[in-house]
Amino acid sequence: MSVLRSQPPSVVPLHLTTSTSRKTEQEPSLLHSAIIERHQDRSVPNSNSNPDSNHRIKKDRNNHTSYHSSSNSESNMESPRLSDGESSTPTSIEELNPTINNSRLVKRNYSISIDPLHDNSNNNTDDDHPNTITSPRPNSTSNKEMQKYSFPEGKESKKITTPSLNSNNCLDLDNSSLVHTDSYIQDLNDDHILLNKRVSRRSSRISAVTATSTTIKQRRNTQDSNLPNIPFHASKHSQILPMDDSDVIKLANGDTSMKPNSATKISHSMTSLPLHPLPQPSQKSKQYHMISKSTTSLPPENDHYYQHSRGTNHNHAANAAAVNNNTTTTTAATGLKRSESATAEIKKMRQSLLHKREMKRKRKTFLVDDDRVLIGNKVSEGHVNFIIAYNMLTGIRVAVSRCSGIMKPLTPADFRFTKKLAFDYHGNELTPSSQYAFKFKDYCPEVFRELRALFGLDPADYLVSLTSKYILSELNSPGKSGSFFYYSRDYKYIIKTIHHSEHIHLRKHIQEYYNHVRDNPNTLICQFYGLHRVKMPISFQNKIKHRKIYFLVMNNLFPPHLDIHITYDLKGSTWGRFTNLDKERLAKDRSYRPVMKDLNWLEEGQKIKFGPLKKKTFLTQLKKDVELLAKLNTMDYSLLIGIHDINKAKEDDLQLADTASIEEQPQTQGPIRTGTGTVVRHFFREFEGGIRASDQFNNDVDLIYYVGIIDFLTNYSVMKKLETFWRSLRHDTKLVSAIPPRDYANRFYEFIEDSVDPLPQKKTQSSYRDDPNQKNYKD
């Protein structure tokens, strides 16, 4: 009596699953039904009753051949189920056990699938009673029995090989090393694909005795919930070939005699998959393996599937042809729409990219490298003054950020209010942690907040410009004050260290300064944005002269994106007000731009070229500013003038931002709008942050002036009075700088008034000229 070993519930013998990987309820396995009906009355003997048969089964198990697909073998080599030393198994039907080649041929429809053989449904089967069923097949089968397994639909049924019987009439179905996975079995002699569901090598640690299998009835009842969803991988499914238009037409006409050939396979191979021509089947055998009807493993983008429909009824072929025709039409229309939309999208992206490149090209060239410093020395980590600069920026960031409530009308107390912040390594509720320990003091925060709003500054932009990167550029003061200048990253703002006396003078007159700025939006006085103090730890007492450092944040009068060709600092005095030029360096070094003074201005016959309208506006505003400074008991201030020559810039072939479009800009611009309200456009900052020169007919010329009153924090103190008395003993009081504030204001205004003329001035040898041989006095 033949013995057929049962399989575990997840084992599918490949010999019986070459047709399809799963079966629908409408197509029950007739072959399985025949086997079960014929052997229902067969008893299941004990494994001990036939030791020879068990011995042969164990022997065959040692020599079994696995039908693991190449793709799945590669993917499971790293799986913990594979023990060390195991390798992948053959992937084609031709590599099966040689005994299979002598098996009988069974004709059947390609749509018929064979389920696993019946097993005891009891999962708690004892190890002493392995699940076995007997095989009913003798070596010679009658014609009646053969008719049960043949299904003559169509012209010719495909033939597949079935496992052969051994000498004891036992069917060799021991494939315990195979379990279900989502994969394929590919025959190298044909282009047919076997869907083997889940195929991989079982772990050797799992005993075949403890494995159980489900009955055919259970298999049929649970097949809908066990439908595999096989993902598509190009490396595993490289030979899945779609149907072309000719195949669709044949299906529509009811022609089911399509035969695969190498030419069709090569021409239909997907471009994204590797192309491997498959060998032709033997002409003698003419045995073709059928392709499964399952389409769950194909990619969702493919609308056509390569199918062999021998043995398929005409109704099914007609339905498939109709679906394929509709799909082809829809795919063609969708592909055309996708092509047009893709072209439009690519064109839009190209235009956007070109626009971004153009905007980047128009940006300021000095900001290309964020770490580059154009003016002065770079103050970054490692610099001797980096700790001071770091503390300044950290204090400004915290103080300005906290001063962001609702703006209220200022009171007299706001002009005397100060706010202290203590920074340490750990931080607290008021201040964040800092890299260094220091104390920060903010003077009149609400007043300077109002001033920043009057000057049209946005708080966020203000903080970003100063504290976006803790990198500043340091510039020593060209004057005698000894102050340090730190430029922000975008060169819009300047941090200037001041003396304690200057800090006291500003705090004393901050209310007058605020009222003047509010009433005179076109004022020439320098714009102050904040007054602060940094107190360093006592450990810095030996490194710096003073532990307390007072500093101001003010505007940079000159634009960072334009070259200032010549600069003048005019006070109205002539004693020591001359700058010796290094002509050789001036010719070689284009960055050498010394600040010229009053005597240089007079020798060169320079004039501020303003027409009648601009001259009147300029002198009117200058008079108001000078009156305020005289009222505040201030002296030693000066008018800083920077001149940008448009023609010279073109001749030098300088790449200046928007310089070529200056002539096309209107003479006046509308008011600018900030978060706090409308701010009137500054009259003297209309063109690139400056004012355009004009002739006697009020026509613009190719010069841009940047003018402003600076250094107006010097109080006429007792020391200045003593200096005035000392200088008057040897020089005329009209020539020296240290004179009373009222006299200083009048002389200053008269000198500037004489310098404003649209016509060039003639060179004169006046009493302003100092003796060149005399030692210059640094004013």
From Swiss-Prot:
GO terms for molecular function: 1-phosphatidylinositol-4-phosphate 5-kinase activity; ATP binding; phosphatidylinositol-3-phosphate binding; phosphatidylinositol-4-phosphate binding. The keyword Cell membrane applies. It is found in: Cell membrane. Keywords: ATP-binding, Cell membrane, Kinase, Membrane, Nucleotide-binding, Phosphoprotein, Transferase. SMART domains: PIPKc. Its EC number is 2.7.1.68. One of its GO terms (cellular component) is nucleus. Catalyzes the phosphorylation of phosphatidylinositol 4-phosphate on the fifth hydroxyl of the myo-inositol ring, to form phosphatidylinositol 4,5-bisphosphate. Acts downstream of STT4, but in a pathway that does not involve PKC1. May be involved in the organization of the actin cytoskeleton. PANTHER family: PHOSPHATIDYLINOSITOL 5-PHOSPHATE 4-KINASE, ISOFORM A, PHOSPHATIDYLINOSITOL-4-PHOSPHATE 5-KINASE. This is Phosphatidylinositol 4-phosphate 5-kinase MSS4. It comes from Saccharomyces cerevisiae (strain ATCC 204508 / S288c).
